Amino acid sequence: VDYDNTLKAYSINNGDEIWSIKTQKSSIRSQKKLSLAIKNEKIYFNNSLGDISSVDINNGNLIWQIPTQSSLAFDTGFFLKTSDIVVEKNALFFSNNQNEFFSLDAQTGNLNWKQEINSNLRPVIINDLIFTISMEGYLIIMEKNTGNIIRSNYLLNKFKAKNRLKIRPAGFIVGNKNIYLSTNIGRFLVIDITTGKARTILKIDNKKISRPAIFNKNLYLITDNSIIKLN
């Protein structure tokens, strides 16, 4: 998906364009990379205006398209930041920094449910639970089928009160016992999944660090100039 809200497919053999599909353009470019997900020969993607589209992967034909923002927000794409789209069974899950968390039917685009959560981080789905972390630093666990909030825990208690407003979650993953959270100030939190309290806070950098990744039982973080491996 390019900056003009056009989805393009290319041949991996020669690089030729196979098909493209345009969605509505905004005169202001989004600050965040756009997301796409693939399942059952369908591509699901968002554009900078908040529209969610479903496209046939073989020919680029549009199956459905759903707006998530009102027409009054036509040129606020610069301010809209949407999370990665996660496809789980027959539903799409995503959220944004406009205090909206959506579940859509993957076949029709119809709304399953909507919840008021302010987050542009990729949600994590485990069995019937959705894990997300808000921009304000709350761990939120929801029921996948209904969107009902089961639990909410504030994660920044160990930081000084005057510093908390400066801290923004940058990305997280969920392990067997812990949740691993990176931040925009270079701090890395290990959170007890049962209590929702931070076990450990590590200083990795003074700037934003990447969403954690796990490979061969090791955890990796990326900073501006390095890749950091944690056991």
Q: What feature does the model see in each segment?
A:
Residues 11-15, 56-60, 105-108, 143-146, ...:
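Short loop/turn segments that connect beta-strands within beta-propeller blades
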Residues 108, 177-178, 183-231:
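C-terminal closing repeat unit and adjoining cap/tail of repeat-based domains
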Residues 1-23, 33-35, 45:
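A generic tandem-repeat structural signature
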Residues 1, 46, 95, 133, ...:
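Residue-level marker for isolated small/hydroxyl-bearing positions within beta-strands
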